[in-house]
């Protein structure tokens, strides 16, 4: 049994989330590109560049086949991604296998012949068609993203949920607009007709990611320290909050843009099981329903992009995807909770960890041991 002295929670980069599903990439240097989501180029131990076809992406919302009761391929319980359901037995039951490194993999179905216990530890991921903001850093009080960008929380939320625009670039000859200005949908439409092509205003999680990635943290830290010398008491409190977040990012290896996600981790299937009941019905955890919503909306958005759908339609679908990810991470913090029958709110990842009945206090802490 492994012993842990402490646990540290940080922000996971897209590369780290992808490496959880691809152990060959752990500890390796590579860059994940959402546009080329199927392949990555990494640097091996000898310093050579190698290309790897990624595995572990959950593409379908299906769980189990209703006829065979076996996991659907590329679904939420896929044996290729998460490992076999029975010890040393692949999905097709054939004995044909080939050696891939240290692993035994069936040539026909691609399932690794190993212990079924790996289904408790192997992770998958969902590659998102559009970035989404992590709700912990947006909605929790105080909002880390709002403080870091020196904006009001309401303004950031309106941009994330595509209700407002923020001016990114503007020509010098336009006096009515300035970078960082918040515009409503109607105002942006008016200015677009008046100054078409002479300014740039964007919305959505992509905009927040762009703003966060362009922050010069060292420069911001120096500016805040200078401002603190002459600031009033009320202003000082606000500046100190911002300084603490900036210093925390500089001291850690985390980057501000990681608060906007291109990839979502899918936890192992044995931690969100489906149980067969009498009469052929299944009982399942709420997490599977929350993941299913994300995959459905993500697939629909990807198809809309491929078809070249109008901006109005894709914007609405992006908002639905953001709301689906919010519900998965923290359903209780949302104004309109995602619920099932009898209006029971679905239990999100945060709800599983939080409170007296949460995983930490109920299962891990305060236990008598021999």
Model feature map: region roles:
Residues 1-370:
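Conserved core architecture of multi-subunit DNA-directed RNA polymerases
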């Amino acid at each position: 049994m492994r012993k842990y002295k402490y646990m540290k929670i940080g922000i996971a980069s897209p590369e780290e989330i992808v490496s959880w599903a691809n152990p060959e990439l752990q500890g390796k240097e590579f860059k994940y590109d959402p546009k080329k989501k199927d392949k990555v180029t990494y640097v091996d131990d000898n310093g050579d560049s190698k290309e790897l076809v990624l595995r572990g992406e959950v593409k379908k919302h299906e769980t189990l086949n209703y006829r065979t009761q076996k996991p659907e391929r590329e679904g939420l319980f896929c044996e290729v991604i998460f490992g076999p359901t029975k010890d040393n037995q692949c999905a097709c039951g054939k004995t044909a296998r080939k050696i891939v490194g240290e692993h035994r993999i069936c040539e026909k179905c691609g399932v690794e012949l190993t212990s079924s216990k790996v289904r408790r530890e192997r992770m998958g991921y969902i590659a998102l068609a559009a970035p989404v903001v992590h709700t912990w850093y947006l909605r929790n009080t105080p909002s880390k993203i709002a403080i870091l960008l020196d904006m009001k929380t309401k303004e950031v939320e309106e941009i994330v949920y595509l209700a407002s625009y923020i001016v990114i670039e503007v020509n010098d000859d336009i006096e009515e607009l300035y970078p960082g200005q918040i515009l409503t949908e109607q105002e942006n439409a008016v200015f677009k007709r008046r100054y078409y092509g002479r300014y740039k205003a964007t919305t959505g999680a992509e905009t927040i990611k762009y703003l966060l990635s362009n922050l010069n943290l060292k420069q911001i830290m120096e500016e805040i320290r200078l401002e603190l010398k002459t600031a009033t008491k009320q202003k000082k409190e606000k500046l100190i909050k911002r300084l603490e977040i900036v210093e925390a990012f500089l001291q850690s290896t985390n980057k501000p843009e990681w608060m906007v996600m291109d990839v979502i981790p899918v936890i192992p299937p044995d931690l969100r099981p489906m149980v067969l009941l009498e009469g052929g019905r299944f009982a399942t955890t709420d997490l599977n329903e929350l993941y299913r919503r994300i995959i459905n909306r993500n697939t629909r958005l990807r198809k809309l992009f491929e078809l070249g759908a109008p901006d109005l339609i894709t914007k609405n679908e992006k908002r639905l995807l953001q709301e689906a990810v919010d519900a998965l991470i923290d359903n209780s913090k949302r104004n309109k909770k995602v619920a099932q029958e009898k209006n029971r709110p679905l239990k999100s990842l945060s709800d599983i960890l939080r409170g007296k009945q949460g995983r930490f206090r109920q299962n891990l802490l305060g236990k008598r041991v021999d």
